[in-house]
Curated annotation (Swiss-Prot):
Record protein name field: Mitochondrial import receptor subunit TOM40 homolog
InterPro entries hit by this protein: Porin_dom_sf, Porin_Euk/Tom40, Tom40
Function: Channel-forming protein essential for import of protein precursors into mitochondria. Plays a role in the assembly of the mitochondrial membrane respiratory chain NADH dehydrogenase (Complex I) by forming a complex with BCAP31 and mediating the translocation of Complex I components from the cytosol to the mitochondria.
Protein source organism: Homo sapiens
Known partners and oligomeric status: Forms part of the preprotein translocase complex of the outer mitochondrial membrane (TOM complex) which consists of at least 7 different proteins (TOMM5, TOMM6, TOMM7, TOMM20, TOMM22, TOMM40 and TOMM70). Interacts with mitochondrial targeting sequences. Interacts with TIMM29; linking the TIM22 complex to the TOM complex. Forms a complex with BCAP31 (via C-terminus) which mediates the translocation of components of the mitochondrial membrane respiratory chain NADH dehydrogenase (Complex I) from the cytosol to the mitochondria.
Keywords: Ion transport, Membrane, Mitochondrion, Mitochondrion outer membrane, Porin, Protein transport, Transmembrane, Transmembrane beta strand, Transport
Amino acid sequence: MGNVLAASSPPAGPPPPPAPALVGLPPPPPSPPGFTLPPLGGSLGAGTSTSRSSERTPGAATASASGAAEDGACGCLPNPGTFEECHRKCKELFPIQMEGVKLTVNKGLSNHFQVNHTVALSTIGESNYHFGVTYVGTKQLSPTEAFPVLVGDMDNSGSLNAQVIHQLGPGLRSKMAIQTQQSKFVNWQVDGEYRGSDFTAAVTLGNPDVLVGSGILVAHYLQSITPCLALGGELVYHRRPGEEGTVMSLAGKYTLNNWLATVTLGQAGMHATYYHKASDQLQVGVEFEASTRMQDTSVSFGYQLDLPKANLLFKGSVDSNWIVGATLEKKLPPLPLTLALGAFLNHRKNKFQCGFGLTIG
């Protein structure tokens, strides 16, 4: 299932409800305001979160591809994953923009309960403090999965982001997310996902209001056609006073041992990504986006260099708008410290932005 609630404080007002925007079921094409899941651990970097979870990408890609090959050999089709995950593997290679200084302290109170404190200082936006809580239940499904999961984050202004994830049965998972802005209720979202042996179906309901007659309903479906090829689609229905509409998108994903190609085509435009695992240390990705509404296209190239022996993770990117960015994450053993540095340069606008982050625990 995709991410649905932002770990950062909500924007100054309720986000506008364009149809695809309320579906934060990822992260992103661009992440809609208020709909990205905060990481279960602490965050790194300044002004944003950068976790080492992406380090598992190479192994996951190889395991997924080898599993697909084995399924094909026995005549079975593999589960294709979720619709929101189609472009995620490529996007994880790109550095996340950082600005200012950020300090995060993580503290595990038990095997199931963790808290974290985050202080962010910025020269562009507002400086803030966040308190986060994560609870992971005792229903163990795999070495890396346990349910229910409760995640909450509150900032110094009293704005809250929270969500609950639970496995209701074999293949059936549900999630509920809410967001408040100080004393005002801003967003809420409920979704359910079912994973079959060779398909995944999901339904999301966002901000339903029976009295006003507004809300967003999103349906996703992804089906394995061959051990390597999966096809699916997305249907978004949105309604509010004086406006009603439907947006449909189709998606295709082709996976081999060391690369993955994905394309999404719909009324809003086209989104294509290519991920390639060059070696155990190097991964590269290319992303193409075309928007019919903005009448604009862009191409981005990103790569990730992982040096486990040096406890170093580097990400870099450049796009067709001449924006160059890079982040460096360095663990400092034997101390429980992680240092993050980031810089972005926009050549067209002559703007430079950098950030520094330190995570303890």
